[in-house]
Amino acid sequence: MDIDKIDQIIDEHQGEASSLIQVLLAIQSENHWLPKEALERVSEKLQVPLIRVQHIATFYKAFSLVPKGRHEIHICMGTACHVRGAMRVLETVQDLTGIKPGETDLDLKFSLETVNCLGCCALGPVMEIDGRTHGKMAAGETADVLKSYE
């Protein structure tokens, strides 16, 4: 991510230190992760100590300090999804992508995470990709859903 884009994001938030989280979220959304150089630039431009920026970036699960895939897959493992076959959906995603929860594939296409609940229990098992919910998933249709994100 280039410095000009980071500066543009900061300027959109009026360069206010109180907008630190919003700035980091915007950079994360644009870049899919927070590179060290971005944290340093945010620290400098917002006049917030780098240690504070790093603290925020490591405290919230929404932020990543390592590259993430263009598409983030979340598999709900809550009780309702679990009893309806979430594990089979997870295993299928792992087989198709070659990654496990917490990993990103080598071509930075997919990152995979499990979550405790996505809040749509009646649709279980649920897979969310880039914020889009796919409900009543079966292992067989998982491949078709993933192909639509290639």
Segments (PLM) and residue ranges:
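Signature of N-terminal electron-transfer/Fe-S-associated modules in redox systems
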Residues: 1-150
